């Protein structure tokens, strides 16, 4: 078996993200626990190969212990919406970037939560037992030299480090939130713009969002799962993909990036505006002159994207 070179490039990491589900040679689907071999063929083409095909690699960059992702990826054509006021829209198109807010700045105090406080003892007991077993079965561990007190101290230390990482991750996880829907949402108009008469919505797709973010390998795009925290925990490594059932109406897709040692309320990520935005909708509660204002702003920044007044303005008959 070839040694790993660990010579990652942005391009090969993008390739892995886009082809990670099955062997690119035989089509064998990877399952949890399988080994995925990422590297170069003799013609220097990228490949992700299973064990049986791994001999075809001329260079092995890395071997992954394959696992299903913590989140469900939306389909490339799934329609996404982001509602905002005009000032935020102008900021986005003038700077050519997208704002990602730190998880600890969200109003929802359950962002990144593992569970409810009443269930914390169950969580702690599970991982305390997990760490004790891991210490006892660690390669090279001499059990005869391991005292009960040492086992207890080390496992409690690991548990404390795990618990401390929760708040650290809330500060180092940055999120851009999107609403997945084939249609406009009146609730979203009212909830996610400060002044509904001064609001717009940009429409895109999951695939266009991915392309607009330059396929950045560090950014993950996935659907939020809505759970009852009284019945279950979220996830050790994927807590930011879970929200309470009471938020299910949001039907949220989010883009997430981890940035450590960044003590900011949010960060700006470069984005290709022309690839990002398919259409711009103006609030149904906005006056007609405001539509003209939005059109003039779009024209000023030389953005060739349709500006439409909300479809919710259509008149009924009885």
For every predicted segment, state its role.
Residues 1, 12, 22-26:
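Non-catalytic N-terminal targeting/anchoring module and adjacent flexible stem/linker
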Residues 23-26, 35, 50-53, 177, ...:
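Generic recognition of cysteine residues
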Residues 43-56:
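Cysteine-rich micro-motifs
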